[in-house]
């Protein structure tokens, strides 16, 4: 199996390591869309869909990611918070991504910061966004909520 993250763990491919423990490794992305954009990976290969993992594996990854996020908050000027997300479509190896939120201050106190983007996604476009869009219709939301509540997990 060819896996760039496995090669990084084995030292076959270099990385800009920022943190590690026995089970996880964190490094700066070589394709950052903001300063400090980082990836936290499991050293053991697991499939990239985070919510398909055993609870213990995912929990450990989240706790490792928290440590790295707090390092980013402390080390990057003007970063009060760091966002975390699981996407899993770039590389099929379990990982989280960390997005330092530059311009949010030097502490994690809440500040209301709203996006000016107003885009609704009908399909995945290769990235995740957390901005709000137009208010949805209550009848449509109620129908969707009912459908989700009635769904049984396999």
Task: Show where each model-derived region lies.
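HIT superfamily nucleotide-processing domains
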Residues: 1-154
